[in-house]
């Protein structure tokens, strides 16, 4: 468990990818901070708006055999925690479990973990359209790769997500 947590905690950015393909990838920073033994606060922000993350969350990491289950929580009124501030003030009553949004990871090499969403029931409304999230995650000691897409609830066609492959975030 400690290796997985060590790989996941930190600050990551896709600056190289965004500079190489500026019309395909925005420059994004992902921060993961340990706030409990196996609990992580996370945020994602455009590099030019680091003080206004577009996504803030808490993850509980639970090991089940060879798998690491990332239990995803929405933070109610998360603004006070932007830029990873006041994290000691996060309490359980501020968190809402996101049913169907767990990510399951497995160790696939000595320094590699791979996984993704475990169901088709992680619901997100995107521009008024009900979608479910599908993602794949690859994690190493130096890189965090994520492919996210939202699929239409009825037609199962892609509504949002990268057309160009994974976001490749390098450890900072």
Describe each model-derived feature in a short phrase.
Residues 1-52:
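Short N-terminal edge-element motif at the start of the domain
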Residues 7, 15-17, 21, 48-172:
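Calycin-type beta-barrel ligand-binding domains and close structural analogs
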């Amino acid at each position: 468990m400690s290796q997985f947590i060590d790989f996941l905690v930190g600050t990551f950015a896709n600056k190289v990818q965004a500079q190489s393909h500026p019309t395909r990838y925005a420059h994004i920073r992902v921060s993961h901070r340990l706030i409990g033994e196996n609990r992580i606060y996370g945020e994602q922000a455009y590099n030019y708006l680091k003080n206004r993350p577009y996504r803030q969350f808490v993850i509980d990491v639970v090991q089940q055999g060879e798998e690491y289950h990332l239990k995803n929580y929405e933070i109610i009124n998360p603004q006070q925690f932007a830029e990873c501030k006041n994290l000691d003030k996060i309490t359980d009553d501020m968190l809402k479990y996101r049913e169907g949004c767990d990510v399951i990871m497995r160790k696939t090499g000595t320094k590699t973990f791979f996984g993704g969403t475990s169901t088709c029931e992680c619901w997100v409304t995107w521009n008024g359209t009900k979608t479910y999230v599908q993602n794949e995650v690859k994690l190493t000691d130096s890189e965090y790769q994520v492919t996210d897409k939202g699929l239409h609830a009825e037609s199962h066609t892609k509504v949002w997500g990268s057309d160009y492959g994974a976001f490749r975030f390098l450890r900072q």
